[in-house]
Amino acid sequence: MKFIVKPHPEIFVKSESVRKRFTKILERNIRTILQRRTESVAVFNRRDHIEVTSESDKYFKETLEVLTQTPGIHHSLEVQQSEFKDLHNIYEQVLERSGALIEGKTFSVRAKRRGKHDFTSIELERYVGGGLNQAVESAKVKLKNPDITVKVEVENDKLNQVIERHKGLGGFPLGTQEDLLSLISGGFDSGVSSYLHIKRGSKVHYCFFNLGGPAHEIGVKQVSHYLWDKYGSSAKVKFISIDFEPVVAEILENVEDGQMGVVLKRMFMRAGGMVAERFGIEALVTGEALGQVSSQTLTNLRHIDNVTDTLILRPLINWDKEDIIDLSRKIGTEDFAKVMPEYCGVISKKPTVKAKKGKLEAEEAKFNFEVLEQVIENARIMDIRDIEKESQEQAPEVEQVQAVAEHAVVLDIRSPDEEDESPLEIDGVEIKHIPFFKLSTQFGDLDQSKEYLLYCDRGVMSRLQALYLQEQGFHNVKVYRP
């Protein structure tokens, strides 16, 4: 088994010292991943290409996966290598391997040569091509757009016949650019934006603001680990989880409805900037796209950016949602994003699309910033490699009911605004109103001899809150889905 790995062309327009550094990093990245996934596969840096070889094909599939999923590789040539005696011997070997392939088709021969020989690359192409044309009567030479291109490479006394060309990711080798912190939610956008910066050579760490309990966190850990394992596993990166429910509760209690969305995003950026500074990370990356939601207008994005000195990168800023979903499908994150929970949480009824600086600052003056500082202090930090076992877990299920049993109590956990807009009324049933952001502190004060059915509009937040309560030892909770 042998592959000739061609680095991305952008690497070769750089200075000699930078080119050497980039290709050395690429060589190291390939070797690091292959050593973890295979045995007895060697990696050699040959100045303008990298060779990956093994005496057997045992790890062919694993090796090919690594070469097509590692940033910095333009393409990899799968080759059959042999020794040759002279020009005619090259022709004989090419005829043996490619003669049957060109029968009844048009073809051309393309050759590359390294080392000292008594023939040029063009002479090699003409000799082999002419010989094939005479030996295979049904084949015809066609130099432009042929059915088959027979590719050969000669290096000193070795002949490499190209079996197949495998497209790589492109971009720069991982670690050639500075580290980034992805504010990942597990949806389509944040997964794609993280991938784009991995591809461009940055080690991407992941910061997750948890608004929905353990089920959401498990899902986001899974997609983060997937991105790292498939495209960036040559690097050690961190996964940081921050329980943002106290921040949401503070916003819902103190901030005017129309400003909630922008204020929440400003809190995300403040927190992200503080985490980035703690770990010496230069920039944040988000999946925001211009105009996709009310907080993503130019005016609102400017106000969001102003709360931190950390650079904020938005690689999807001018992308259509359809294009984002298409790329997520291609890179394998679509299935994660499709099942990622959505929330009944901080949704302004009339969100501002053009926030005013003075108004935002006045609303944030009501916010207790000690809450934000505390959740950052309590952030859970882990090596993403430790997620592997957890990534196999599935969020536990909680029982859902359509009818209310006798003596059961329905807990409406929607925000006060949602409750006012669409009151829940059920004849003969006791209904209590406890917003989800107060449930963890107030549920223990209820009569625990009763059964409680949690309700919200979509049934997602109620399920997540029920799971959380069960984790705390309360087993008298179910989800009400009429």
From Swiss-Prot:
Protein name per Swiss-Prot or TrEMBL: tRNA sulfurtransferase
NCBIfam families: ThiI_C_thiazole (TIGR04271), tRNA uracil 4-sulfurtransferase ThiI (TIGR00342)
Pathway in which this enzyme or protein is active: Cofactor biosynthesis; thiamine diphosphate biosynthesis
Catalytic activity: [ThiI sulfur-carrier protein]-S-sulfanyl-L-cysteine + a uridine in tRNA + 2 reduced [2Fe-2S]-[ferredoxin] + ATP + H(+) = [ThiI sulfur-carrier protein]-L-cysteine + a 4-thiouridine in tRNA + 2 oxidized [2Fe-2S]-[ferredoxin] + AMP + diphosphate; [ThiS sulfur-carrier protein]-C-terminal Gly-Gly-AMP + S-sulfanyl-L-cysteinyl-[cysteine desulfurase] + AH2 = [ThiS sulfur-carrier protein]-C-terminal-Gly-aminoethanethioate + L-cysteinyl-[cysteine desulfurase] + A + AMP + 2 H(+)
Lineage, highest ranks first: Bacteria, Pseudomonadati, Pseudomonadota, Gammaproteobacteria, Vibrionales
Binding-site residues, ATP: L183, I184, K265, G287, Q296
CDD domains in the record: PPase_ThiI (cd01712), RHOD (cd00158), THUMP_ThiI (cd11716)
GO molecular function list: ATP binding; CCA tRNA nucleotidyltransferase activity; tRNA binding; tRNA-uracil-4 sulfurtransferase activity
Protein task: Catalyzes the ATP-dependent transfer of a sulfur to tRNA to produce 4-thiouridine in position 8 of tRNAs, which functions as a near-UV photosensor. Also catalyzes the transfer of sulfur to the sulfur carrier protein ThiS, forming ThiS-thiocarboxylate. This is a step in the synthesis of thiazole, in the thiamine biosynthesis pathway. The sulfur is donated as persulfide by IscS.
